[in-house]
Regions:
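Nucleic-acid substrate recognition interfaces
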Residues: 1-239
């Protein structure tokens, strides 16, 4: 049986690659916003004509040619998905608004597809369109067939890559053995075989730290340097 599995790693691009990643993020965001604006204008004026394609936008804005063309195509598909969800919620009585993408978003990302082995992993490097081989912190092996990757950048100026692969999953053999599990407060669980599993309370401790950091953030003045620094601390706890 096959299923999709994602492998996420910290990217370590060089300075030139950072510039191109930032440019790709900006171009995808620009194209999404331009198409959304065009779509809204046509909707208000009841214009049924088709939207301009990313190829037509490249003629108007030549600097769009500098980045991965597949990433731009995916940005257009993201807008289509957003509009489909918008009308689906509208029909079900859940009015919502389509928002423009902001460069001030704490996390920006773009997605690209593996076409003719354009994306591949070699040791601790991954080959990406336009970027070439980019180093990453290889914490585990990437298995299966690479379908797509998502490159992201967070508020801490850290770059990450999520590699989506199609992997073969082995079906576990059926067993007639049974075990009872009792979840508790002091111990995480106790089995019918009298096995005790301790409760490290990682989630509880993390939630307390996050709550304290968010409380401090709420007291910081909007737009201030101290608020921006506190936002980074909150985001670091979310990682």
């Amino acid at each position: 049986m096959k299923q999709l599995k994602a492998f996420k790693f910290r990217l370590e691009p060089n300075q030139q690659q950072k510039v191109l990643i930032n440019k790709t993020l900006g171009c995808c965001r620009f194209l999404y916003n331009q198409m959304l604006l065009e779509k809204q204008t046509k909707y208000k004026s009841k214009d049924d004509s088709k939207l301009k394609t990313e190829k037509e936008y490249k003629i108007e804005f030549e600097w769009l040619k500098e980045v991965d063309s597949i990433a731009l195509q995916q940005s257009r598909l993201d807008l289509k998905t957003a509009y489909d969800n918008f009308f689906r919620k509208l029909k079900s009585g859940q009015p919502t608004n389509l928002k423009f993408k902001s460069k001030h978003n704490p996390k920006n990302s773009y997605r690209t597809i593996n076409v003719n082995n354009s994306i591949r992993v070699e040791e601790n490097r991954i080959k990406l369109s336009k970027l070439g081989f980019v180093k990453f912190r290889k914490s585990r092996e990437v298995s299966g067939t690479i379908k797509s990757v998502t490159v992201s950048k967070n508020i801490l100026n850290r770059y990450y890559i999520s590699v989506l692969c199609e992997v073969e999953v082995k079906t576990l053999p059926t067993s007639n053995s049974k075990v009872g599990i009792d979840l508790g407060l002091k111990e995480f669980c106790i089995t019918s075989d009298n096995e005790f599993v301790s409760n490290p309370k990682y989630l509880r401790n993390s939630e307390l730290k996050l709550k304290k950091a968010q409380r401090k953030l709420s007291k910081r003045k909007k737009g201030s340097n101290r608020r921006f620094k506190q936002q980074k601390k909150v985001f670091r706890l979310h990682e």
